Structures are given as C-alpha cells and as structure tokens.
C-alpha cells in the first residue's frame, strides 16, 4: 500500500510476508495492519480513481471513512475533454519524469514498491496543483458538494448487480444459437459461399470485389447502412437482403458472446464497472476487466483464448427491439424485492425547449403525444394516427418522427439524420427506411414549426463558443454551488464542434439531475438498493412492503426543479415529470399508479358556520 503525507515523501507498506514480499515478523505485520486501518479510517484520503482502490481495500477488511479528494474527478471538473489518467495528469501538473516504464510492472519487487510510493507522492502533488484551476473556473463547490458524492453512489451500483435467472438464460442461449445458424444458412443460399459476417476482410471481398458494389471505406455498421441508403447503391434485392442479414447476425453473435455468455461474479450476481467521467457528463459501464476481477478460464485447458472477463455493460440493455428485451428478461431482483424504475419523461427535449425559451412547446409536450404530433408534421395525418396511447404500440412513423426531432434539436443535417434513423430502425427491427430527401424535407418542416430552437438555442450556444469556447451547465436541485459543470471545447471550429456543444447542455443537465436525485433518494431511503443509473433513469430494488412509502418520495426527488439561472444560457427553473414502473424482472416493467389516500374525517379542517349551511352540489 502506497502512502504519502507530503508531496516530497512517500512510502510503500508491504501487506504480506510470504513469497519474498517482505521479512516482517507476523506480530509486527499484525500491528502494521492495525495502524493502517486506523490511518485509513481517521485521515482524509486523496486518491486517483479511488473507487478502484477502495474495492480492493474493502476485500482486505479496511474501511474508508471519507474520500477527501479524487484527482480523476477533479480533472473531470476542470477539463472534461482531456485525459484523466495519472500519467497524463503527472505530465501537466508536475515536473516528475515519466516513471511507469521503469520496471514498475515488469521489473523486480523493489521497482514495484518505488513506483507505488511515487504514485502516492504525485497524486498528492497533482491534487494541490489542481486547486488553482478549480478556483479559476468557479467549480470548487460543485466539485466538493456534488462530484465527490458520486464515488459512494457508484460503488453501491458496482457492488449490487443483478440476479440471473439461469433457466431463462439457457433458453435464450438456445434461441440465439438457432437464430445465428438460420442466418448463416440463409446468407449461404444467397451468396453461394460461406462468409464470416464478423470478418471484415471476407465481407469486403464479397461486396466490393465479387459483387462490385460501390466501395466504402469499411464494412462496419455505419458504412453498410450508408451503402444501403444510396439510391443506386445496392440494386439487386438478394444483395440487399444479404447485407441486412449480415448486420443482423453481427448483433445476434454479439448478444451471445457479450451478454448471454457473460460470466457472473463469484456469488452468482452479474455486475458491472462504472466510469463517471465521460466528456458530456454521462457515465458508461463495462465488463469487470482485470485487475478489477481476474479472467476466468471457461474451458479449463489454460489457453489464453479461453480466458473470459467477468461481468457485462449494463447501460446497453435497451428496452427497444427484441434483443434488448430478451437480455433484460433474465435479470431479476433478490427474493422479496421488486424493481422500481424512475424515468424522466422526454427529459432532453424539455431541456432543449427551455433553452430555446419555447413555452408553447413545454406546454404541448404535457398535453400531446409529442413524437406522434411531430410525425404528423412530416408524414401527414393527425396525432391520433400515430399515437402510442391510441394504438397501444409504437408506430414506425412515430419512431421516425421521434428520431428526426432529436436530430433537429442537435442541428444534424439530412445525411446524418437519415443514417441514424435507418441504423436505429434496422437495429430494433422497425419496418421503416428513409432517404436523405425525406430527412431534409422533415428537418425544414421541423425548424419552420419550431423556429426558436435554431434562432435562440443554437444561436446562443454558438455565441458562447465564440466568446471563450466554454459552456456552463445547469445546476441540479439541492447542490450548494454557484454553477454547474463547465466544459471547455477543443474541437476545431465547424459542424463537429457545434454538434458537440449543442448536445452538451441537454445531456449534462439531465444526467446531473438524475445523479443528484439518486443521491438524495439513497440518503432518505438507505434500505433501497440502487442497481443502475442510465442517464435519465434510475433502477432500484425495493422491498415489496416498502413500495407505497418509497415511490412517492422517489418520484418527488426526480421531479425537483433544475436551476438554469447561472447556466451559459440563463433560463427559468425547469421541472421534468417522472414516470414510475415496477416489475419482477428488468424486461416486464409496468406503470405504477400512486394511490391517492383521502384525509381521514378526524384530520380534516373543520368547516365554518357558513360552510356548514351551504348546499353541497
């Protein structure tokens, strides 16, 4: 364990006296462990991505009372776009030469001890050097009072995980292997040869050398979708069918290898690893890559190719389409618990309307099926023709209206909008495709119907970029800070920069609001188990008998107002409605209607003499 109480001095404390690690006597080693436990509990701890270290310390029996500072989160508060690893931070905040290649991981034990002590010293030095930048940007309170609350929140997510229904999982594996074999046979019938859909070389040779289709730079999903979108790109229907089956088979095989065959943790639960510091403010999840968990030999022969990582990424379990729903169905809460999902309703769209000062749109979104209404602008008809409430399912036209609206919010052009729509439709098996002409016409109608999005929101964001290339996000409710998260943009001037900047404020506002709500809910309901944070939604496991108490409180916290007063685009406060769903697995979630309990007669306010004699209709 590396310790440093001063940036000029550090030490490494061996925790074992076996395998030539140290020659410390057992009695002294026991005293050292007691002293370390006291230091970790009593002192303010500074670390780099300290949730990783804390997990290892917890498994050794050590407890941390308080993380005083985390240089990874501090780097995120200062510059979300720059790398946040210790090596990079050392290079820009200290004069310490690069030392990671001096045998720390490949050399002798002494080299490892020296490297560990150096890590401790430079972490402390970096933390002190960052304070000036933190104060200059005015985000110290935001960092201390909000960002530093996130490690505890995400540590619980990583520790909880899903229970896996083995019988459902086995049935899904059988279903998807049959699906994969069927697609292989159908593709062989069309092409006349066996082609591995995951081999880009084989797919490239078939499409461009054998079939002479218009050449693309690659054969990934985006390139093949663009090829299918060309008016005269794929003229022969069997060729089109083969490409679509190729894309479908890739998704099926990824589902088998990455999700259905994922390795649970030692207690049988499926867990994930959270990364809190994407440049937009959002989080991502991934497998439990080493050294978080060791690789598992799935065959037992000791071959490197048979080694597999534990866990899986949770946030990719989309509820759209059949594949996402299938994967969700095998995940369940512990016995006696049910899942409660809190989902902010059309959150990013509401933030965009507020930033565009479009009060009519904020009113209409509560009174209409807004995606169906948007679809009627583009494709004719009326809202009820495509309404999800009327039809009972999502119409392909409604899906197109929703996707094109999101493209319009973020200033996308016709090509990007059509490619995104066709890619998503194919992924979720929604029977609709459009070409650039339809997308261009739809975007023109959209901006004519809602001109304030371009004239106010887009214009004001670009003006902020012209001033200092900096945007300040709104502030979640209950955070003691002057301003929200700050991002400095380094992309070169142009459409890519504008697209990133337009997406930042809505995404950061929504994700910070969700995280802050989750922290408040956990503080008030410590027995509820947080399973997942997914940008605009939270998933909890709650005891069945506590549902009536938990849901009204959680819904209230999710609907707290977001503060836009010190945002780069100052606006009024905004409340985002929250939909509540419950279920016994992650797929079959249904709406939960909060019961309204009338006030008992003895608690009601007594009527006046006049009210008692008035006629009640």
Task: Walk through the language-model features, giving the residues of each.
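Short, contiguous acidic/charged loop-to-helix segments that flank catalytic cores in large enzymes
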Residues: 20-23, 259-265, 275-278, 295-298, ...
């Amino acid at each position: 364990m590396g310790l440093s109480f001063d940036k000029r001095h550090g030490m490494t404390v061996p925790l074992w006296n076996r395998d030539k690690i140290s020659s410390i006597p057992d009695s002294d080693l026991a005293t050292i462990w007691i002293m370390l436990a006291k230091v970790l509990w009593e002192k303010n701890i500074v670390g780099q991505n300290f949730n990783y270290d804390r997990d290892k310390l917890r498994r050794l029996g050590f407890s941390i009372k308080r993380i005083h500072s985390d240089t990874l989160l501090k780097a995120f508060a200062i510059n979300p776009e720059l790398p946040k690893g210790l090596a990079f931070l050392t290079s820009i905040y200290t004069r310490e030469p690069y030392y990671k290649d001096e045998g720390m991981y490949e050399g002798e034990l002494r080299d490892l001890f020296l490297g560990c002590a150096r890590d401790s010293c430079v972490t402390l030095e970096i933390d002190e050097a960052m304070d000036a930048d933190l104060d200059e940007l005015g985000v110290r309170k935001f960092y201390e009072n909000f960002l530093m609350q996130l490690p505890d929140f995400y540590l619980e997510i990583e520790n909880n995980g899903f229970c896996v229904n083995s019988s459902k999982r086995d049935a899904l594996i059988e279903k998807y292997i049959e699906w994969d074999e069927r697609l292989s046979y159908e593709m062989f019938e069309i092409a006349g040869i066996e082609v591995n859909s995951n081999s880009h070389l084989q797919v490239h040779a078939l499409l461009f050398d054998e079939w002479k289709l218009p050449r693309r730079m690659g054969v990934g999903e985006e390139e093949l979708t663009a090829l299918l979108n060309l008016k005269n790109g794929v003229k022969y229907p069997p060729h089109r069918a083969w490409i679509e089956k190729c894309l479908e088979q890739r998704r099926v095989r990824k589902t088998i290898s990455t999700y259905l065959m994922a390795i649970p943790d030692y207690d049988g639960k499926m867990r994930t690893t959270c990364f809190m510091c994407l440049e937009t403010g959002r989080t991502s999840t991934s497998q439990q890559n080493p050294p978080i968990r060791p690789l598992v030999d799935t065959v037992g022969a000791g071959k490197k190719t048979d080694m597999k990582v534990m866990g899986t990424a949770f946030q990719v379990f989309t509820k759209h389409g059949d594949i996402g729903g299938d994967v969700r169905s095998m995940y369940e809460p512990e016995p006696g618990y049910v899942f409660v999902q809190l989902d902010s309703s059309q959150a990013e769209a509401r933030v965009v309307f507020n930033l565009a000062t479009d009060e009519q749109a904020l009113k209409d979104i509560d009174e209409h099926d807004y995606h169906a209404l948007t679809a009627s602008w583009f494709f004719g008809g009326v809202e009820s023709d495509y309404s999800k409430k009327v039809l009972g399912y999502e119409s392909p036209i409604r899906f197109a209206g929703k996707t094109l609206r999101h493209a319009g919010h973020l200033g996308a052009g016709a090509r990007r909008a059509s490619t995104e729509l066709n890619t998503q439709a194919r992924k979720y098996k929604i029977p609709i495709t459009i070409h650039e002409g339809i997308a261009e016409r739809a975007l023109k109608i959209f901006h004519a119907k809602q001109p304030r999005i371009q004239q106010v929101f887009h214009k004001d964001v670009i003006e902020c970029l012209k001033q200092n290339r900096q945007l300040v996000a709104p502030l979640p409710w209950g955070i003691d800070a002057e301003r929200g998260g700050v991002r400095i943009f380094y992309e070169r001037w142009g459409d890519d920069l504008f697209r990133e900047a337009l997406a930042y404020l809505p995404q950061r506002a929504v994700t910070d609001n969700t995280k802050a709500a989750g922290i408040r809910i956990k503080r008030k309901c410590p027995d509820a188990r947080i399973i997942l944070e997914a940008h605009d939604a939270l998933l909890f496991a709650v005891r069945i008998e506590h549902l009536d108490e938990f849901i009204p409180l959680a819904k209230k916290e999710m609907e707290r107002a977001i503060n836009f007063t010190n945002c780069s685009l100052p606006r009024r406060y905004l409340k985002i409605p929250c939909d509540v769903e419950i279920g016994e697995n992650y797929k079959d979630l249904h709406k939960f209607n909060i019961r309204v309990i009338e006030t008992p007669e003895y608690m009601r306010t007594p009527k006046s003499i006049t009210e008692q004699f008035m006629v009640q209709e």
